[in-house]
Regions:
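Hydrophobic/aromatic residues within transmembrane alpha-helices
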Residues: 41, 53, 108-110, 166
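Single conserved hydrophobic/aromatic residue that forms the stacking wall/gate
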Residues: 176-187
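Glycine- (often His-adjacent) and acidic-residue-rich active-site loop
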Residues: 10, 14-17, 43-82, 101
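Short, flexible helix/strand-to-coil boundary loops that buttress conserved ligand/catalytic motifs
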Residues: 15, 52, 58-61, 127, ...
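Short, glycine/polar-rich helix-capping loops at beta-to-alpha or helix-loop-helix junctions
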Residues: 159-164
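CoA-thioester-processing core
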Residues: 82-88, 96, 102-156, 169
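Conserved CoA-thioester-binding segment of acyl-CoA-metabolizing enzymes
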Residues: 1-44
Length: 187
């Protein structure tokens, strides 16, 4: 089964308020269907996922409107639900990273049991640059994927890495060199 993050006009930014429920329902459906043996997740357009919607954060709307307590509760109900749902998949998840995977996008990609990337991919956790904490589980997951020292460097400096570095560090298993932007990564 192939899942495509499909908001290319927003670089597949996440989440919209309904995304927690949508990811949970999709994962539940996969877990209930024994004919599905694997899920491949990729992004539409030129990005895997830009992560959080910075414009919504700045404008304090949608997930980010209201009091701190209201934002925290929505974050748990939406973002944490997405991460828990993906973590709870009972079939292998292949992250086919076709372009930038930043913040929440990097963390979701990191949940893949197998991670492959286009040579156009890049990875980063720019939370410090934005003055916010990484609250979606990535600070727990990233050290398990690339080791403590490298994870700390990325988390503390907000530096991004290219696909070749991600492969060297073990964040992705292999690179696929794309000659045509529409060629699927999972073939």
């Amino acid at each position: 089964m192939v899942w495509t993050l499909d908001r290319p006009d927003r670089l597949n930014a996440l989440p919209d308020l309904e995304d927690g429920e949508a990811f949970a329902a999709a994962c539940d459906a996969v877990n209930a269907d024994p004919s599905i043996r694997c899920v491949v997740m990729t992004g539409a357009g030129r990005a895997f996922s830009a992560g959080g919607d910075l414009k919504a954060m700045k404008d304090r709307r949608d997930l980010f409107e209201g009091s701190g307590a209201a934002i925290r509760e929505r974050y748990r109900r939406v973002v944490h639900r997405i991460v828990r749902a993906l973590y709870g998949l009972e079939v292998p998840l292949v992250s086919a990273v076709n372009g930038p995977a930043m913040g929440l996008g990097c963390d979701i990609a990191g949940l893949g049991d197998i991670r492959i990337a286009s040579d156009r991919a890049s990875f980063g956790v720019p939370f410090m640059k934005l003055g916010i904490i990484p609250g979606d589980g990535g600070s727990w997951l990233l050290p398990r994927n690339i080791g403590y020292n490298r994870a700390a460097e990325l988390l503390f400096t907000a530096r991004s890495i290219d696909a070749a570095t991600a492969e060297q560090w073990g964040l992705v298993l292999s690179l696929i060199h794309i000659s045509e932007p529409t060629r699927p990564l999972y073939i």
